[in-house]
Curated annotation (Swiss-Prot):
<keyword id="KW-0963">Cytoplasm</keyword>
<feature type="active site" description="Proton acceptor; via carboxylate">
    <location>
        <position position="451"/>
    </location>
</feature>
<keyword id="KW-0808">Transferase</keyword>
<dbReference type="Pfam" id="PF02799">
    <property type="entry name" value="NMT_C"/>
</dbReference>
<dbReference type="Pfam" id="PF01233">
    <property type="entry name" value="NMT"/>
</dbReference>
<dbReference type="InterPro" id="IPR016181">
    <property type="entry name" value="Acyl_CoA_acyltransferase"/>
</dbReference>
<dbReference type="GO" id="GO:0004379">
    <property type="term" value="F:glycylpeptide N-tetradecanoyltransferase activity"/>
</dbReference>
<keyword id="KW-0012">Acyltransferase</keyword>
<comment type="subunit">
    <text>Monomer.</text>
</comment>
<dbReference type="GO" id="GO:0005829">
    <property type="term" value="C:cytosol"/>
</dbReference>
<comment type="similarity">
    <text>Belongs to the NMT family.</text>
</comment>
<feature type="binding site">
    <location>
        <begin position="185"/>
        <end position="189"/>
    </location>
    <ligand>
        <name>tetradecanoyl-CoA</name>
    </ligand>
</feature>
<feature type="binding site">
    <location>
        <begin position="177"/>
        <end position="179"/>
    </location>
    <ligand>
        <name>tetradecanoyl-CoA</name>
    </ligand>
</feature>
<dbReference type="InterPro" id="IPR022676">
    <property type="entry name" value="NMT_N"/>
</dbReference>
<comment type="function">
    <text>Adds a myristoyl group to the N-terminal glycine residue of certain cellular proteins. Substrate specificity requires an N-terminal glycine in the nascent polypeptide substrates. Ser is present at position 5 in almost all known N-myristoyl proteins and Lys is commonly encountered at postion 6. Basic residues are preferred at positions 7 and 8.</text>
</comment>
<protein>
    <recommendedName>
        <fullName>Glycylpeptide N-tetradecanoyltransferase</fullName>
        <ecNumber>2.3.1.97</ecNumber>
    </recommendedName>
</protein>
<dbReference type="GO" id="GO:0072657">
    <property type="term" value="P:protein localization to membrane"/>
</dbReference>
Amino acid sequence: MSGDNTGNKSNSAPSKSIEELLKLLAMGQELSPAQQKEMKDYKFWKTQPVPSLSETVTEEGPIDKLKTPEDVPNDPLPLISDFEWSTLDIDDNLQLDELYKLLYDNYVEDIDATFRFKYSHEFFQWALKPPGWRKDWHVGVRVKSTGKLVAFIAATPVTFKLNKSNKVIDSVEINFLCIHKKLRNKRLAPVLIKEITRRVNKQNIWQALYTGGSILPTPLTTCRYQHRPINWSKLHDVGFSHLPPNQTKSSMVASYTLPNNPKLKGLRPMTGKDVSTVLSLLYKYQERFDIVQLFTEEEFKHWMLGHDENSDSNVVKSYVVEDENGVITDYFSYYLLPFTVLDNAQHDELGIAYLFYYASDSFEKPNYKKRLNELITDALITSKKFGVDVFNCLTCQDNTYFLKDCKFGSGDGFLNYYLFNYRTFPMDGGIDKKTKEVVEDQTSGIGVVLL
């Protein structure tokens, strides 16, 4: 899970170990030059099938020599004597509670220890159990003597397509790499990465998608985090937003106030009956991007409507727009992952929404930008009833078309997209490569949205 370093926090955390650098990588956080050099020079990454930072890609394709699952060892990698591998059963609420505690105490946290992700059982079920999921891809490490869970890494199946070369590749998304704070000197991170790679390779999958800060060879592109305040007053109370010069709290609240009801005629929640139609709309729309995710209808239903088809999801929200003839012309989705707020007398939780996938049939029409702004404005409005205080997105997809008019602001965090064991040509990330500022009204190359 990659997240922006919220607020205007310092990016100069001390460099101590490879595990801490990987932790910062998971935060999508900019590192100091010394940290970047340490990561770049670390021997582990030189052994991995990733492009070097200095090479120019002349041809797309796998980096490693062709292998088969029979070439992959059957046994897990050895761990130091005090620890043992543990495959987590996320259908077991007790083990989910263990994972929650590990992540809550040790996962992504801003440097000032102000915010932590507040995961729910439902979120874990949604994020870790899409169609095609495998139990042995939920990899834990426990202390032998006590059974305590002290590390975790996960993989979930993802099929992606490179539109320019028309190549379709089975892969996984790597997520939730987490190591207990007291074990950062045990060099568990490289072992976890190698072990999840081994398990994925045994299923004849040789590529992986992942995201992180600008410290690894070699990103497809860099995107920048964007934030749209929904409840500015609360964001100010917890230190997420600051009062600009020559502004009052009242003026800031008024600036970000949204209507109570959506504006688009024909907007309604997406249902299971819409899956096939919306997926077709998305595929046509996403032809404009360089890299996209392909879904079966079963996968798309899971990601858009949630893990339990018999109840409304508390994690992901999807809406469609129907015209007067009942034809679906647009759709949007976002997922909810709140923060726990630490050491604040007024608030203990911050509602966070993350823009997910969207599509419109107006992408070739003159009114496309206007339509996209209307669509995302309604996404912001609908999020209010779910307790959202800030709505986040990246500069991927066509997001730069609506950021200014919808009053998003650039955050401090940057997120790189990476492909493991595959070379591709560089892609546009919606920002200027030198200044890192948003390039308005420019289609990015990234049509994949990872958790």
